[in-house]
Regions:
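Conserved helicase ATPase core of P-loop NTP-dependent helicases/translocases
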Residues: 147, 163-174, 325, 335-342, ...
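Post-DEXD/H (motif II) to motif III coupling segment of the RecA-like Helicase ATP-binding lobe
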Residues: 200, 208-267, 441
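Walker A/P-loop
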Residues: 107-128
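Conserved Walker A/P-loop ATP-binding site and its immediately adjacent core
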Residues: 121, 130-155, 329-334
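A conserved SF2-helicase RecA2
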Residues: 246-266, 399, 407-467, 482, ...
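Conserved helix/coil segment N-terminal to the catalytic DExD/H
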Residues: 167-201, 212-217
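Conserved RecA-like P-loop NTPase helicase motor core
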Residues: 354-444
Length: 543
């Protein structure tokens, strides 16, 4: 009996061939838990990324191959060939050719990381059809992504037959060349062993989601001979990127960030208001900021929303070529924006939020002002005409969101991209998030200007030297002749530089007026919003 075999359930190794120390290592190493802040009050539950039968352990392919060595055999089916009549009609850009070559050299298993607008979907289709040529399955986590893959497949591979795996629907017969599967369906249903044997390739779109406990089950349910993960953001803040890397393999090709682009402008409005309805930081019993309540508070404060509209409306009138994407964490906030812009005479307004049908999303994509949630804009939004974005609620990581207005090539732009940012000065957390956004803007070479400064001044033109400039002499925060600079002092210097870069406060051109006091109403806050717990389906059905 062979000691180790690559199977559609994972790297299968005999228990009898393992020592007690090796078994202990498997169980310890492959039981993971997310990293959480020290202030996290919930329960962190570890979960396993391996399964076992009475005789074998089934382990993630890449991890086990590294730890135990190559398997004795590969029992994964090669998959059915695609019809010879199908032809990939796209033209690869140089970086896409490099990505495919790296994927091929890695044995058709690994992760490709490309920024927003660099053609991840295009590259994935080329890999499956042009490079491998076997029937393939694409796993997505949102329905609008499935629709985007469908449209791209039809455009690039005319005549391709596309099936779906969603809910009760399971199009995997020989009449389909490719199936697009919803990951929620894959993780919640038990499929008989061999169900997906006709597929030679699996593509996991937005693969970083597979680090989560529930979605990670997809890695154990669909395993093909060729496995490709696509993402723009492979690093998870909870430290669980290793979960999908253990199954798919390492990152084989990555463009971490776009080249610096000083044509992208950042306009920052400093919002100052001492109304306690807005300015009092919500905290828990330990005095820690409750972020969800803080976002609710900021989004619900209508004078702030009105100030933003008053700031932006003249720009849209003066520059009719601007196409604006407004992002918020709260749908009610977007509705307030829609009402206020309509009152200003803007009629071309559309929503881009979860739950909308693709036809309605396509209609919204034609509007001058698009109101969307961060969740929808973080992945898959493809509206090349967008050139302006308003970050209406504070966030730290905005790279994916900003990428939505940078899909056009620099030489093809008719309007320079513009990011509209807002600094909520009342909150320490918001100031910290601004520091991270500013660091991102600086790393991208964007020009930062404040709304209450003269138009011809900016951070870069005010004499600040770039961090990459060798001659930039920085005054240390502390001087210690006996000790080298530490990471701590470097971080403190960055904070001081960020605070120093914020211009001294002058009465802003736009300032909220304190609303008339309203009758006091009893507020009811339920800190525990109950959710339904999903019943886990068995991984496999065996006779």
């Amino acid at each position: 009996m062979q000691r180790a075999i690559q199977t559609t359930r994972g790297y299968a190794i005999l228990k009898s061939a393992l020592s007690a120390a090796q078994i202990s290592h498997i169980q310890k190493e492959l039981t993971v838990a997310p990293n959480v802040p020290l202030s996290y009050a919930g329960t962190v539950t570890p979960f396993k990324v391996w399964v076992e039968s009475s005789t074998r352990y089934y382990l993630p392919h890449a991890w086990a191959s590294t730890y135990f060595g190559p398997a004795d055999a590969d029992a994964r089916p090669p998959g059915d060939s695609l019809p010879s009549t199908l032809e990939f009609k796209g033209t690869l850009r140089p970086h896409q050719e490099e990505a495919l070559a790296a994927f091929r050299d890695a044995g058709h298993s690994g992760i490709i990381c490309l920024p927003c607008g660099y053609g991840k979907t295009f590259t994935g289709i080329a890999a499956a059809t042009q490079l491998i040529g076997r029937r393939f399955i694409i796993v997505v986590h949102k329905e609008f992504l499935a629709d985007q893959w469908t449209a791209e497949l039809r455009a690039l591979v005319p005549g391709i037959r596309i099936g779906r795996i969603q809910g009760e629907r399971c199009d995997i017969g020989p009449q389909f060349d490719v199936a697009i599967a919803m990951i929620q369906t894959i993780c919640s249903r038990a499929y008989p062993i061999g169900t997906f044997d006709s597929f030679g390739t699996v593509i996991f779109d937005e693969v970083h989601h597979l680090g989560a406990e529930h979605f990670s089950q997809a890695l154990q349910r669909i395993q093909c001979r060729n496995m490709l993960g696509l993402t723009a953001t492979p690093n998870r803040v909870d430290g669980l990127s290793k979960v999908f890397e253990w199954s798919l393999g390492r990152i084989v090709y990555q463009i971490a960030r776009r080249p610096k682009d000083d044509s992208v402008g950042v306009r920052v409005m400093r919002y100052v208001c001492d109304d306690p309805v807005y300015a009092n930081t919500p905290t828990n019993w330990r005095g820690e900021t409750v972020r969800a309540r803080l976002i609710n508070q900021i989004a619900a404060f209508k004078p702030r929303t009105s100030a933003l509209v008053e700031w932006i409306a003249p720009m849209l009138r003066d520059e009719p070529g601007r196409r604006l994407l407004i992002l918020s964490d709260r749908r009610e906030h977007l509705m307030d924006f829609a009402t206020l812009f309509a009152a200003q005479g803007f009629a071309s307004i559309g929503y881009y939020v979860g739950g909308m049908k693709q036809a309605d999303l396509d209609m919204s994509a034609t509007k001058q002002i698009i109101l969307g949630t961060y969740a929808m804009a973080s992945e898959g939004m493809n509206i090349p005409t967008l050139n302006t974005i308003l970050l209406a609620t504070p966030k730290s990581n905005i790279e994916q969101s900003v990428g939505r207005i940078l899909r056009q090539k620099k030489e093809e732009r008719l309007v320079a991209p513009r990011i509209l940012d807002i600094l909520d000065t009342a909150f320490m957390e918001a100031n910290g998030q601004w520091a991270k956004r500013r660091k991102f803007y600086k790393s991208c070479g964007y020009t930062i200007k404040w709304s209450d400064e003269p138009e011809n001044t900016s951070e870069s033109s005010a004499g600040e030297m770039d961090e990459d400039t060798p001659t930039a002499a920085k005054t240390p925060l502390f001087v210690d002749d006996d000790a080298p600079p530490t990471a701590c002092s470097k971080e403190l210097n960055e904070i001081v530089e960020t605070l120093a870069s914020i211009p001294p406060y002058e009465p802003p051109t736009i300032k909220s007026t304190k609303p008339k006091p309203k009758p006091k109403a009893k507020r009811i806050y339920n800190p525990k919003d109950p959710t339904l717990s999903a019943t886990k389906a068995p991984l496999f059905i065996e006779d």
